[in-house]
UniProtKB/Swiss-Prot annotation:
Source organism of this protein record: Xenopus laevis
Single Gene Ontology BP annotation: positive regulation of transcription by RNA polymerase II
PANTHER family for the chain: TRANSCRIPTIONAL COACTIVATOR YAP1 (PTHR17616:SF9), YES-ASSOCIATED PROTEIN YAP1 FAMILY MEMBER (PTHR17616)
SUPFAM superfamilies per UniProt: WW domain (SSF51045)
Modified residue annotations for Phosphoserine: 30, 80, 98, 134
Protein name (record): Transcriptional coactivator YAP1-A
Subunit structure: Interacts with tead1.
Annotated GO CC locations: bicellular tight junction; cell-cell junction; cytoplasm; nucleus; plasma membrane
Protein family (similarity comment): Belongs to the YAP1 family.
Length: 459
């Protein structure tokens, strides 16, 4: 069987697995495979290495086996100069990001500046590093007449001279600046606001000289140095012209000696400013006061809610009636607002059928059915306001020890609502009762040993 036919069954395994599935390869005899790899390295002569074609027999181009020939230098920006000669090139270092005060440069010989702004007669520089190519001039500085600036696709600037129809990498404005700076007399560093034919320096600028005599300018406002004279900037020229036009208007006239009236008039601006400051301060104080009120108001409401209503309105009540009513209210509230707890005969402790969720552990009294009819015929009279009862309920623990013996568990009596069983039990009278009604109730309940029919009317 041919070797090609042995590989056909394994062809489906070469297909990529479906999306979301993984293929796991299991090597049954990995030790033999590893041993074969080691033998192939240790004994290359005995190993069955696959035969490979030599490099010469492969389909490779002829240039693969030949060394590249040195080609003639093409005309490029790196291998050319403005004059066209590329034989005497020397390395030139970029000074665009350097400080002009820390450079050691040779002075540039003066030359004649033509009316078009092009230097016509420059002496050969003493160093190959020309100052004109070491810094950048902003684009807003005007070019000499007849010149135009353009940029290459890579973003580098070059200049076109339409007078003689030539192009150059050198900025013609640098030649103008060097001519102006070199013609200045060599002297120690000049201080700020030097008077030159072009006028004084702007405010914050200072001119200084390097050890070689080159002039540079220091900007004290942003702490920077520049080779460019700020007086050549057209923006500075426009500012100077505007200042010169406004100078006569701004000149103050001679003022007479100040008098009290003129002093008051002269300080009108200060008074207006002071008034505005006071108004702003007043507004800030008002906002701060409102903020403090917003912070204090919740605390004040919380304190008021904690004070009982009886204590707040205690001064307006009649002191004579207060003691009697309070005693009756105590008696009534001790019994959970149920006047039938003091009867003794009808009260009995029943078996509790509650689920145990209630906090109360005492049973509710059962009122006999024959007594309910007589209660409906009684005159209830005027009722005391219900708002006073919850206030007295908070004082249960203070009076429970002084009560006479009843069937109520004093240790477990608390101020929470009782869970009652609806229809079988008489609902407690939550409304407060007057002293007359309480006396009538006690009279009726106390006559248990007498004949009930003499006191009650049955329907």
């Amino acid at each position: 069987m041919e070797p090609g036919s042995q590989q056909q069954p394994s062809a489906p395994a070469q297909q990529p697995p479906p999306v979301g599935h993984q293929v796991v390869h299991v090597r049954t005899d990995s030790e033999t495979d590893l041993e074969a790899l080691f033998n192939a390295v240790m004994n290359p002569k005995n190993a069955n290495l696959p035969q490979t074609l030599p490099m010469r027999m492969r389909k490779l181009p002829d240039s693969f086996f030949k060394q590249p020939q040195p080609e003639a230098k093409s005309h490029s920006r790196q291998a050319s100069t403005d004059g066209g000669s590329a034989g005497a090139l020397t390395p030139q270092h970029v000074r665009a990001h350097s400080s002009p005060a820390s450079l050691q440069l040779a002075a540039v010989s003066p030359g004649a500046l033509s009316p078009q702004g092009v230097v016509t007669g420059l002496a050969p520089p003493s160093a190959p590093h020309l100052r004109q190519s070491s810094y950048e001039i902003p684009d807003d500085v005007p070019l000499p007449p007849g010149w135009e600036m353009a940029k290459t696709p890579s973003g580098q600037r070059y200049f076109l001279n339409h007078i003689d129809q030539t192009t150059t990498w050198q900025d013609p404005r640098k030649a103008m600046l060097s001519q102006i700076n070199v013609t200045a007399p060599t002297s120690p560093p000049v201080q700020q606001n030097i008077m030159t034919p072009t006028g004084p320096l702007p405010d914050g600028w200072e001119q200084a000289l390097t050890p070689e005599g080159e002039a540079y300018f220091i900007n004290h406002k942003n702490k920077s140095t520049s080779w460019l004279d700020p007086r050549l900037d057209p923006r500075f020229a426009m500012n100077q012209q505007r200042l010169s036009q406004n100078a006569p208007v701004k000149a103050p006239p001679a003022l007479p000696p100040p008098s009290p009236q003129t002093g008051v008039l002269g300080s009108g601006g200060n008074q207006q400013m002071r008034l505005q400051q006071l108004q702003m301060e007043k507004e800030r104080l008002r906002l701060k006061h409102q903020e403090l009120l917003r912070q204090v108001r919740p605390q004040e409401l919380a304190l008021r809610s904690q004070i009982p209503p009886m204590e707040q309105d205690g001064g307006t009540q009649n002191p004579v009636c207060t003691t009697g009513i309070s005693q009756e209210l105590r008696t009534m509230t001790m019994n959970s607002s149920d006047p039938f707890l003091n009867s003794g005969t009808y009260h009995s402790r029943d078996e509790s059928t509650e689920s145990g969720l209630s906090m109360s552990s005492y049973s509710v009294p059962r009122t006999p059915d024959d007594f309910l009819n007589s209660v409906d015929e009684m005159d209830t009279g005027e009722a005391i306001t219900q708002s006073t009862i919850p206030t007295q309920q908070n004082r249960f623990p203070d009076y429970l020890e002084t009560l006479p013996g009843t069937n109520v568990d004093l240790g477990t009596l608390e101020g929470e609502a009782m869970n009652v069983e609806g229809e079988e039990l008489m609902p407690s009278l939550q409304e407060a009762l007057s002293s007359d009604i309480l006396n009538d109730m006690e009279t009726v309940l106390a006559a248990t040993k007498l004949d009930k029919e003499s006191f009650l009317t049955w329907l």
